[in-house]
Regions:
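Glycine-rich, N-terminal phosphate-binding loop of Rossmann-like dinucleotide-binding domains
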Residues: 30, 92-94, 242, 277, ...
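Conserved G/P- and acidic residue-centered "switch" motifs that form tight phosphate/ATP-binding loops
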Residues: 127, 232, 276
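A glycine-rich (often HGG/GG-containing) alpha/beta subdomain
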Residues: 1-150, 154, 158, 169
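Switch II of P-loop NTPase G domains
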Residues: 75, 278-308, 312-318
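Generic enzyme active-site microenvironment
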Residues: 274, 309, 326
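C-terminal-of-GTPase-core extension/linker across diverse P-loop GTPases
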Residues: 2-20, 142, 146-266, 283-286, ...
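Short active-site oxyanion
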Residues: 24-27, 89, 305-306, 320-324
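Switch I (G2) and immediately adjacent beta-strands of P-loop GTPase domains
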Residues: 56-77, 255-284, 305
């Protein structure tokens, strides 16, 4: 997988692999062919150093010999390590200043501070991780809900990669048969209708995977749900009820909410950002309230779901468009129309949560059990769409165009699928992907 590396260096890199906060234990990780030699400059280690066995050692600065810590040192000999290179982990005490000194000592010994995601990038380069599994590592760290964690874990364990590799192999097999027919035209090959069926099956399978992307993207990125409506419709009360805590000030006077408030909530496995906004009205608003209304309209433009909250004691009204219309205060006057809820009693809140979730995920389900294939990344979805288009063209043109063109379409589809797992991608894309990682990953 050397084609994945930018000007890849054989130097030794170092970074904190655990969180940058006070903790009982911190793990400082070194990777590179000189990592064990550098570790010996920091601590007296046995010769030979046993692999995968913890060795208790005293760390000291390589030049001043000032004692630093008593740590556990573990050596992972490449290629049987995370990066595929020799890796040394120093398990030391986790004070922030203390870890800074250990890292400084490692740099003094000859290590270079790792770039963001460089450990994972080296693992991809040396074939320890496929690209989509490396992406799943970041998703695993950032997951906010059980469902998002399950989707990330499934991808990390190879569910997406296996599905895509299987499709790519089938496409390459079909392409090889087309090329064999070109090389040996007198031999009886697959009839055009059979070639079309097989290409169409590949396209359909790509579309099946693509159909999971709407819910997959919501699992990974979350969704923005904005509550809007006239002043005093009960938006802030509803916001507090959905958030499960008193975040917004509630008062009988209209126009109490002047700015936008946010709360992160788990709705059926989707991490939703719930936004409370200033009431929207045409007349009577002061200067500050008008600014709040401007911010409310800006939030609505960003929303994945727009919820229009009305008051059950007032005539049912709502804007035109694809809004989820909710009638609040149904405890005061039931039968007001729309989706009836009461922020005060909690009536209808479960139905509201489900209605929001349906709009976020469409017909999919916000669940991803271990091994289930869910497409969470836009990059993967775009490549699957490209592959589906290429296979569909091949199916449509079978028997109508020269076999060379058919083979080209099949090859194009296979290449798109292979890029999902990292084959044939360029350095600029890798730079973009791994720049999102923290330094220790």
């Amino acid at each position: 997988m050397d084609h994945l590396a930018p000007a890849f260096q054989d130097d030794c890199i170092v970074a904190l692999a655990t969180g940058a906060a006070p903790a009982g234990i911190a793990i400082v990780r070194l990777s590179g062919k000189r990592s064990l030699g550098l570790a010996r400059r920091l601590a007296k280690l046995p010769e030979p150093m046993p692999a995968r066995q913890a060795v208790l050692a005293r760390l000291a600065h390589p030049e001043s010999q000032q004692p630093l810590d008593e740590a556990l040192v573990l050596f992972f000999q490449g290629p049987a390590s995370f990066t595929g290179e020799d890796v040394v982990e120093l398990q030391c005490h986790g004070g922030i200043k203390h870890v800074e000194q250990v890292l400084a000592a490692a740099r003094c010994a000859g290590a270079r501070v790792a770039e963001p995601g460089e450990f994972s990038r080296r693992a991809v380069r040396l074939g320890r991780l496929s690209l989509e599994r490396a992406e799943a590592l970041l998703d695993l760290v950032n997951a906010e809900t059980d469902a998002a964690l399950s989707a990330a874990r499934s991808q990390l364990l190879g569910a997406v990669g296996r599905a895509v590799e299987e499709l790519a192999a089938s496409a390459q097999e079909l392409r090889a048969e087309v090329e064999a027919a070109l090389d040996f035209p007198d031999d009886a090959g697959e009839p055009p209708n059979r070639l079309a069926e097989r290409a169409l099956h590949l396209a359909a399978r790509c579309q099946e995977l693509l159909a999971t992307h709407r819910v997959g993207r919501a699992l990974r990125e979350g969704a923005r749900v904005v509550l809007a409506g006239a002043p005093n419709a009960g938006k802030s009360s509803l916001f507090n009820a959905l958030a499960g805590e008193e975040r917004a000030i509630v008062d009988e006077d209209p126009g109490t909410t002047r700015d936008c408030l946010e709360a992160r909530v788990d709705l059926g496995g989707i991490a939703c950002t719930l936004v409370d906004t200033a009431g929207l009205r045409g007349e009577g608003a002061g200067r500050v309230e008008l600014r709040g209304m401007e911010r409310a309209r800006a939030e609505l433009e960003r929303a994945a779901v727009q919820v229009w909250v009305t008051d059950a004691t007032a005539p049912l009204s709502g804007p035109q468009g694809d809004w989820l219309v909710v009638t609040n205060k149904c405890d005061l006057r039931p039968g007001g129309g729309g989706l009836e809820v009461s922020a005060k009693t909690g009536a209808g809140l479960d139905r509201l949560r489900e209605a929001i979730l349906e709009r976020v995920r469409g017909t999919g389900q916000a669940r991803a059990s271990s091994g289930e294939v869910v497409i969470t990344h836009r990059r993967h979805a775009e490549l699957l769409a490209s592959a589906a288009g290429a296979f569909a063209r091949a199916a449509e043109n079978a028997g109508r165009v020269p076999l060379e063109i058919l083979g080209y379409d099949l090859a194009e589809g296979a290449r798109a699928l292979e890029q999902v797992v990292g084959r044939g991608v360029d350095d600029a894309l890798l730079d973009t992907i791994f720049a999102r990682f923290c330094i220790g990953k």
